[in-house]
């Protein structure tokens, strides 16, 4: 029988979960939340409430607290900061002991950090801005099935970014016509083509038919060009059993890479598929469909940098990241920050890029950043400058929309990429001299010349909704 006294009733969260003098441990999970409390709720109380509800707390004192070491297991709100430009919101920094989380389980981490607390009445809005995953926990996770260097070795592609294309129209093509589009793109010079996120197994194109026609197209393009090619076969399915059936069939027919929608498919399915890919030598492309539901509102949800970290833990060799210059939302500094979080081994805190904590990935492989969404040849200099070589540049409409057809669109993109890489390696400034570099290359490539004429007026100049806090620039 414990000698501790037990006092029933309700007490302020800050009495237990607010510890401004707490010394953060290397083994702690750290989280930064942007909090907008309800009127009349003090900042310390709101921060402590978030710490409690995302760890050991509930709305009242319970006698079973005496049966464990609550002081060891609880989350602690240890720091509060103002949010520049927002008088209502503040940043709450919370530390969680590593033993609160099951090893190698992104599912359990997110169930704890964001599973219940986002509906808490004490806060008007809540956003998870960043997390620090301790190295001790990173080492329990398998991470990407292969990573950047292994993929380059498998595909025999070095010294430049990879080129891809999403087949369009994304829905409605027959399997035979879909395969034809794949073949034209790959023979024209692309490294990969891909299924779009919502291509699964619809009445107009069942998955098995698509896989067979696409693999035939891929192998034919390989034989003609002498280059290794691939198509991201989307194995996302109604159930895990069907997902693995599709993955096994892709392996049987010789496909080098498959694809998964990791947010709609779920972290459990994604982690299992990543482990299967590692065991079976398959590359894994990850689409982020549904991400903007969670990450676009600057006051509520989960920032994409957190989702990117979660994917690296769960496993994937590619991840869509936005483009900065294309049709999708993306602040440049923030995008460069999460590109590094996907690829580098150690990323220091850098508020100018929205990174709130140091992140050490140890020996975990990196992930190719995928730039996709409304891009064309005129964007190539900026893309190479922003993303570097360890990226996949995917031109859907920017390939299939070429007036001369898919193969010509692919050739235009290949010439533009190689011209930009060559110019960069010679020391030229791509963002300042990009127009001249492309115009010079177009003198020897009629496909590129026509592409430049076709899309010379196409821009996506809209104000970014989710901006970095301006005083951290």
Curated annotation (Swiss-Prot):
Gene Ontology MF term list: magnesium ion binding; monooxygenase activity; ribulose-bisphosphate carboxylase activity
Coiled-coil annotated spans: none
Binding-site positions, substrate: 116, 166, 170, 288, 320, 372
UniProt-listed Enzyme Commission number(s):
4.1.1.39
Question: Which cofactor is recorded for it?
Answer: Mg(2+)
Q: Which residues bear the site annotation Transition state stabilizer?
A: 327
Q: What class of enzyme is it?
A: lyase
Q: Where is Mg(2+) annotated to bind?
A: 194, 196-197
Note on how the cofactor is bound = Binds 1 Mg(2+) ion per subunit.
User: Which PANTHER family did the record assign?
Assistant: RIBULOSE BISPHOSPHATE CARBOXYLASE, RIBULOSE BISPHOSPHATE CARBOXYLASE LARGE CHAIN
Which HAMAP family does the record match to this protein? RuBisCO_L_type1 (MF_01338)
Function in brief: RuBisCO catalyzes two reactions: the carboxylation of D-ribulose 1,5-bisphosphate, the primary event in carbon dioxide fixation, as well as the oxidative fragmentation of the pentose substrate. Both reactions occur simultaneously and in competition at the same active site.
Q: What is this protein called?
A: Ribulose bisphosphate carboxylase large chain
């Amino acid at each position: 029988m414990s000698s501790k006294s037990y006092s029933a009733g309700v007490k302020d969260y800050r009495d237990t979960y607010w510890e401004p003098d707490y010394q953060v441990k290397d083994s702690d999970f750290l989280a930064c939340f942007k909090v907008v409390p309800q009127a009349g709720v003090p900042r310390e109380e709101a921060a402590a409430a978030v710490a409690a509800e995302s760890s050991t707390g509930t709305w009242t004192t319970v006698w079973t607290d005496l049966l464990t070491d609550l002081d060891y297991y609880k989350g602690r709100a240890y720091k509060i900061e103002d949010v520049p430009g927002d008088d209502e919101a503040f940043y709450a920094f919370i530390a969680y002991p590593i033993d609160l989380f099951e090893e190698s389980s992104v599912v359990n981490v997110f169930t704890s950090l964001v599973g219940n607390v986002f509906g808490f009445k004490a806060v008007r809005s809540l956003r998870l801005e960043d997390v620090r995953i301790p190295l001790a926990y990173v080492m329990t996770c398998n991470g990407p099935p292969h990573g950047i260097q292994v993929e380059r070795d498998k595909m025999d592609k070095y010294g430049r970014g990879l080129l891809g294309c999403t087949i369009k129209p994304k829905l409605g093509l027959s399997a035979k016509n879909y395969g034809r589009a794949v073949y034209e793109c790959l023979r024209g010079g692309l490294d990969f083509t891909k299924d779009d996120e919502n291509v699964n197994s619809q009445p107009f194109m069942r998955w098995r038919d698509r896989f067979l026609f696409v693999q035939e197209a891929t192998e034919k393009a390989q034989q003609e060009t002498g280059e290794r090619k691939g198509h991201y076969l989307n194995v996302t399915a109604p159930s895990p059993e069907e997902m693995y059936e599709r993955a096994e069939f892709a392996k049987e027919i010789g496909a080098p890479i498959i694809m998964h929608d990791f947010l709609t498919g779920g972290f459990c399915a994604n982690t299992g598929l990543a482990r299967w890919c590692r065991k079976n030598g398959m590359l894994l492309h990850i689409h982020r469909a549904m991400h903007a539901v969670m990450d676009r509102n600057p006051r509520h949800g989960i920032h994409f940098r957190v989702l990117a970290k979660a994917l690296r833990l769960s496993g994937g060799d590619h991840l869509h990241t936005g483009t900065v210059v294309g049709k999708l939302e993306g602040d440049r500094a923030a995008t460069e920050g999460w590109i590094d979080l996907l690829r580098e081994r150690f990323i220091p805190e850098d508020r100018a890029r929205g990174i709130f904590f140091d992140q050490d990935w140890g020996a975990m492989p990196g992930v190719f950043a995928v730039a996709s969404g409304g891009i064309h040849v005129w964007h190539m200099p900026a893309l190479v400058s922003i993303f570097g070589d360890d990226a996949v540049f995917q031109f859907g409409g920017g390939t299939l929309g070429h007036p001369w057809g898919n193969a010509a669109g692919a050739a235009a993109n290949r010439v533009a990429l190689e011209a930009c890489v060559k110019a960069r390696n010679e020391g030229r400034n791509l963002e300042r001299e990009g127009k001249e570099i492309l115009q010079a290359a177009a003198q020897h490539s009629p496909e590129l010349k026509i592409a430049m004429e076709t899309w010379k007026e196409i821009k996506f100049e809209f104000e970014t909704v989710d901006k970095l806090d301006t005083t951290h620039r």
